[in-house]
């Protein structure tokens, strides 16, 4: 994995104070690339005991159209370079189909957080 990606994770951890949270053990950290016509189906991820599967996602490449995150029935407009949080173990989430040749690329960093840790924080929480 390129050092630049670990640098982005370090920045996300520092910015949102995630140092004390364990890493989500199943998906851990991942890079998602979705090309034209692809989408993420609506789903909810599993939690670990009393800890909530929480993901902080960086929108590395925003497609020409579509690829918009949907969290708990709400479309979340995330600019390229923006960060969006998903309480993946609590809320149904997906993304709309990608339109055009430009792919949707996200870096997704997974954590386990206590219930309510991020309540009141909007889904799209940082912009470039």
What are the functions of these language-model segments?
Residues 1-16, 26-36, 53, 104-106, ...:
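N-terminal accessory scaffold of Fe(II)-dependent oxygenases
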Residues 10, 41, 120-123:
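Intrinsically disordered, low-complexity segments used for protein-protein interactions
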Residues 62-128:
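Catalytic core of Fe(II)/2-oxoglutarate
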């Amino acid at each position: 994995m390129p050092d630049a990606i670990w640098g982005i994770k370090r920045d996300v951890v520092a910015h949102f104070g995630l140092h004390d949270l364990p890493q989500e053990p199943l998906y851990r950290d991942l890079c998602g690339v979705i090309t034209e016509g692809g989408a993420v189906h609506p789903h909810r991820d599993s939690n670990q005991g009393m800890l909530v599967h929480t993901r902080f996602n960086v929108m590395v490449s925003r497609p020409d159209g579509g690829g918009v995150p949907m969290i708990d029935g709400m479309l979340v407009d995330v600019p390229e370079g923006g960060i969006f949080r998903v309480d993946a173990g609590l809320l149904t989430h997906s993304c709309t189909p990608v339109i055009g040749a430009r792919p949707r690329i996200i870096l997704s960093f997974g954590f386990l957080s206590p219930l309510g840790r991020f309540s009141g924080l909007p889904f799209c929480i940082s912009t470039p």
